[in-house]
């Protein structure tokens, strides 16, 4: 609420030189929980024979997984030539890595969340609400819901059932 439509891009740009630059991009593009970033997220580009194009792939290992809840593994994919600025930024980042592969892992989930709040405050000092890692997650879900069905968003967030869809 009350943020520009580019708020994720703005936060990622502000944090681009910091130690969480990669994690910010991953959080914005997957809706991953900070604890999932602490586990580590694999990112790579591969050629998809069916689509006949390069695909940016992100593999998230779920953390809220039990026998009857959660997705143990999630894959999020974007076309490498997607013109979304966050996809383009991650593709550019991968271009400097051998084999266009990268493992993004943070040391502490709490520190990452604190850094997002710090970056947001530096951009929007007078904003009424705290901007947290959960905001990235909710925005990712809203984006998926606007272009697909709600069940796809629930699965992408790691929920096993649409019943656990809260946003």
Identify the function of each model-found stretch.
Residues 19, 32-34, 73-76, 90, ...:
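Short, cationic motifs built from Arg/Lys/His that form the positively charged side of catalytic pockets
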Residues 2-34:
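Basic, Lys/Arg- and aromatic-enriched nucleic-acid-binding interface segment
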Residues 23, 117-120, 150:
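Generic structural marker for isolated residues within well-ordered, non-membrane alpha-helices
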Residues 39-86:
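Conserved tyrosine-mediated DNA breakage-rejoining catalytic core shared by Y-recombinases
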Residues 130, 147-167:
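Short, polar N-cap/turn motifs at the start of nucleic acid-interacting alpha helices
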Residues 20, 26-40, 146-149, 159:
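A short, glycine-centered helix-capping/turn motif at helix boundaries
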Residues 78-129, 134-135, 140, 145:
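Active-site/catalytic core of tyrosine-dependent DNA strand-transfer enzymes
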Residues 39, 139-143, 155:
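DNA-binding alpha-helical recognition surfaces that contact promoter or target DNA
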């Amino acid at each position: 609420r009350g943020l520009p439509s580019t708020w994720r891009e703005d936060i990622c740009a502000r944090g681009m030189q910091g130690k969480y630059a990669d994690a910010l991009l991953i959080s914005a593009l997957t809706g991953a929980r900070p604890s999932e970033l602490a586990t580590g997220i694999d990112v790579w580009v591969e050629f998809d024979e069916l689509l006949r194009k390069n695909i940016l792939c992100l593999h998230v290992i779920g953390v809220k997984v039990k026998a009857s809840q959660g997705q143990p593994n999630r894959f999020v994919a974007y076309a490498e030539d997607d013109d979304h600025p966050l996809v383009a930024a991650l593709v550019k980042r991968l271009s400097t890595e051998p084999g266009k592969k990268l493992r993004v892992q943070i040391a502490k989930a709490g520190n990452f969340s604190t850094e997002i709040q710090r970056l947001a405050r530096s951009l929007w000092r007078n904003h009424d609400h705290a901007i947290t890692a959960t905001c990235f997650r909710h925005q990712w879900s809203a984006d998926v819901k606007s272009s697909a069905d709600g069940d796809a968003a629930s699965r992408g967030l790691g929920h096993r059932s649409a019943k656990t869809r809260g946003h």
